[in-house]
Amino acid sequence: RNRPASFGGFLSHAAMAVILVGLIGSSMYVTDKVAYIGYDEATDTASETFQIKDYTLEYVSNSVTEVNNGDVIMYTVNYDAYKDGAFIGQVSPSVQLAQKTQQQKLVASVISLPTEDLFVVYRGVNNDGAFSMDVRVNPLISLVWAGFGLLMIGVCVATAGRRRASRKLT
């Protein structure tokens, strides 16, 4: 009888299943690596590359910039990202330091691929001058976004399906 509303409801429920698979898969199969990358300030070079799964991060540069008239200082590192040796983009994670409150805010950099996301966080510099890096590979996260898109389509289809006033037979 009310096919658009039924189909929209079915599509919305199927979308929730896709979102659930994406969330479970991305949390159960995440690959996480925390490491220090040696840095030589005199030559502005890193002593090594950062390896995680089939990804390689190669140091490019770093910068310190003042934002909001010096109220915030941003420490940023720039890396070229490679997957299986092929360049996939550049990541520029940073640490923001609020001068007045001395609070730090970590700003991640993400490269999204069809099957997984490369999530890069710069945590600052240790006493030896090495960069503290936290890198994660989140698989199946794109399923969450695809599921959300399906959910919105399902809601629109279900809402667009007109419901007729029911007649009571006597």
How would you describe each model-predicted region?
Residues 1-170:
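Solvent-exposed, non-transmembrane regions of integral membrane proteins
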